[in-house]
């Protein structure tokens, strides 16, 4: 281990030793992730991090992902530029949790509890997750397949959308500009009048980025309408649409010419919810869809490609749950889900637009269905002891049925602290690409399966809160592309055995100063996973004085695996690097705020995706207006 991780841990230990004697009950967070009803985290056996809107907006980032990467131990998000992640070859935005990869569909992103992933490739589309829609983000570390099913194998990121709680009208406008021709802007309006509330927002951003032919442009909007029929019943409908255009230059040593992407993603959902003293529940319908058009480019600038890759996909479903307190200390949740997953991948001629006939499974269409039922029961046996158990039966139209159990216990030896133990199973059904698309595809694939064993401790004091997690992951049936005879084939031949530790702490020194830090240590016994660092540490400081707010964060990455061949195997390792980011906000008055951000202020030379060196120091500045 290098000296800088040790120094960051020493600072954490010194803070805990100095301030642990100040014991008082802090305001506890309530969450909806990992449990369908609103629940105090002290009674849940799993670990959930909450990143609120103030944290999401203090650095004026357009995406939620850079912020949650800093705030959540064990989470890594890949990047290749100042703005934009892109899709297809060379894309960034891959999300890793404890060495379990969202790029392989093993980590699930939700919007208001509804799954979001590409119906062809099974992975999240990271450019879709914009800050303007989010009231808060809840991140569950570890499997959550009992509640959410397939893909919630390594963890869950749940984006809880914004809503207005008090009567009134609020309008926010934010604009900014900075390095490499980067321009960002967004506007939102929230209204509540009696039983009706609404939220409408729009966003635009563009940049040239730091390499030639790496431009990125994005625009989109979000709409949410809600109505409270009675104090106990309400309904809402929301929609989110985003479109981005991206250019792709290839690796720095292997340039690609003419590569471009035109991507549209959308989400629509509607729900009816009930909330009584002893029971609460919801019935919702949802769909997320995509339209992709991609020019893969050419290694020879004089020989442009003659076709576009295109895809259409949709994930449409119905979700129902009802949670009830049957007697003192009890909570029973019953639920059922149905999902229809559609994917269509094909090529068209650039000149005529005609659909092309392609050999070797280069094109394909797939329809898959999943239906599931589940229950989760939580019981306080005594005031200091809670037991939790859940079970899901999930049936896939191709791979068959899968039983998913979880068990947990929470012991509260102090009114301000709890020990949690959790054993849970996660799984992932194979994607359309793995079963039907390209020569290695295999229609006989089975679900990937994973068991997670976890022990954690949380303690909340007057000004200090801290926690620690130990985990062990044992996964099998991992889908790998394997050499079989003279060709390659996707097989359930892989295994993952990861274990590690995570530490986190927050200390509010006084009204002006606050510190937060988190650290994760990961050991991968089988092989190193791409973009899963062996150590990730973060130390942040917030300073507020009158109208001035300053936020600074120092992130240290060690043992980051890189894939130099494109086969998904970490065959190289990036040297350790330290990133210093800072944001400054100055409130001129109650309406206008001036802001400035700096990233990689130490001008580090590093890469997260092999062949895509990151920019050195970059800057943004702008203004926020609140009416």
Task: Locate each region found by the language model.
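Short, acidic, small-residue-rich periplasmic hinge/interaction motif at the N-terminus
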Residues: 21-57, 65, 465
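Extracytoplasmic beta-strand/coil segments of soluble accessory domains associated
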Residues: 66-114
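Outer-membrane beta-barrel signature, preferentially recognizing the C-terminal barrel domain
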Residues: 107, 252-275, 311, 366-368, ...
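Short acidic/polar hinge/loop motifs at secondary-structure boundaries
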Residues: 114-141
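Short strand-turn segments of transmembrane beta-barrel domains in outer membranes
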Residues: 156, 161-191, 202, 207-214
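Flexible loop and strand-edge segments within Gram-negative outer membrane beta-barrel domains
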Residues: 207-214, 218, 232-315
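Structural signature of Gram-negative outer-membrane beta-barrels, strongest in the C-terminal barrel
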Residues: 230, 327-331, 357-475, 508-512, ...
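Gram-negative outer-membrane beta-barrel transporters
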Residues: 380-383, 472-474, 491-563, 587-593, ...
């Amino acid at each position: 281990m290098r000296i800088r991780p040790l120094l960051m841990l020493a600072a954490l230990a010194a803070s805990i030793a100095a301030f642990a004697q100040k014991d008082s009950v802090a305001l506890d967070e309530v969450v909806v992730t990992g449990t369908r009803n609103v629940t105090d985290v002290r009674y849940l056996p799993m670990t959930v991090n909450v990143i609120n809107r103030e944290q999401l907006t203090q650095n004026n980032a357009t995406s939620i992902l850079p912020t949650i990467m800093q705030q959540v131990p064990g989470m890594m998000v890949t990047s290749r530029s100042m703005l934009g992640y892109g899709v297809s070859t060379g894309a960034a935005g891959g999300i890793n949790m404890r060495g379990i990869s969202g790029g392989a569909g093993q980590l699930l992103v939700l919007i208001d509890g509804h799954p979001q992933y590409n119906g062809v490739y099974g992975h999240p589309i990271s450019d879709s997750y914009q800050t303007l829609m989010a009231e808060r983000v809840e991140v569950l570390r570890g499997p959550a397949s009992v509640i959410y099913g397939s893909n919630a194998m390594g963890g869950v990121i749940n984006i809880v959308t914004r809503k207005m709680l008090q009567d009134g009208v609020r309008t926010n406008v934010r604009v900014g500009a900075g390095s490499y021709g980067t321009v960002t802007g967004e506007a939102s309006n929230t209204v509540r009048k009696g039983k009706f509330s609404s939220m409408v927002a729009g966003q635009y951003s563009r940049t040239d980025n730091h390499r030639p032919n790496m431009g990125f442009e994005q625009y989109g909007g979000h709409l949410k309408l809600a109505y409270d029929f009675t104090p106990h019943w309400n309904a809402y409908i929301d929609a989110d649409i985003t479109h981005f255009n991206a250019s792709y230059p290839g690796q720095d040593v292997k340039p690609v010419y003419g590569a471009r992407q035109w991507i549209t993603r959308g989400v629509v959902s509607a729900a009816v919810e009930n909330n009584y003293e002893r029971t609460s529940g919801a019935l919702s319908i949802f769909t997320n869809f995509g339209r992709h058009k991609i020019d893969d480019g050419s290694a020879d600038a004089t020989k442009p490609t003659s076709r576009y890759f295109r895809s259409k996909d949709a994930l449409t479903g119905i979700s129902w749950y009802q949670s009830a307190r049957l007697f003192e200390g009890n909570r029973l949740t019953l639920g059922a889900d149905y999902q229809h997953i559609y994917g269509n991948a094909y090529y068209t001629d650039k000149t005529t637009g005609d659909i092309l006939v392609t050999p070797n499974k280069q094109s394909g269409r797939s329809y898959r269905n999943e239906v599931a039922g589940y229950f989760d029961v939580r019981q306080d046996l005594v005031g200091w002891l809670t037991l939790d158990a859940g079970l899901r039966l999930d049936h896939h139209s191709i791979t068959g049925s899968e039983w998913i159990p979880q068990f947990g216990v929470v012991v509260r030896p102090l009114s301000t602290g709890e020990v949690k133990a959790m054993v849970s199973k996660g799984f992932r059904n194979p994607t359309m690409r793995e079963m039907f698309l390209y020569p290695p595809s295999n229609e006989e694939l089975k679900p990937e399966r994973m068991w997670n064993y976890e022990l954690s401790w949380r303690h909340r004091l007057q000004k200090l809160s801290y926690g620690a997690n130990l985990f062990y992951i044992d996964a099998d049936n991992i889908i790998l592309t394997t050499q079989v005879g003279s060709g390659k084939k996707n097989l359930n031949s892989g295994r993952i055995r990861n274990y590690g530790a995570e530490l986190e702490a927050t200390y509010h020194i006084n009204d002006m100063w606050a510190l937060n830090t988190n650290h994760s240590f990961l050991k991968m016994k089988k092989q190193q996973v791409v973009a899963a660092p062996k150590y990730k540490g973060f130390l942040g400081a917030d300073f507020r004085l009158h109208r001035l707010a300053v936020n600074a964060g120092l992130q240290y990455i060690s043992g980051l695996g890189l894939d130099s061949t494109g086969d998904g195997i970490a065959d190289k390792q990036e040297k350790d690097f330290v990133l210093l980011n800072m944001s400054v906000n100055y409130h001129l008055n109650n309406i206008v705020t001036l802001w400035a951000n700096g990233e990689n202020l130490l001008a580090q030379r590093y890469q997260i995706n092999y062949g895509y060196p990151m920019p050195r120091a970059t800057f943004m500045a702008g203004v926020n207006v609140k009416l």
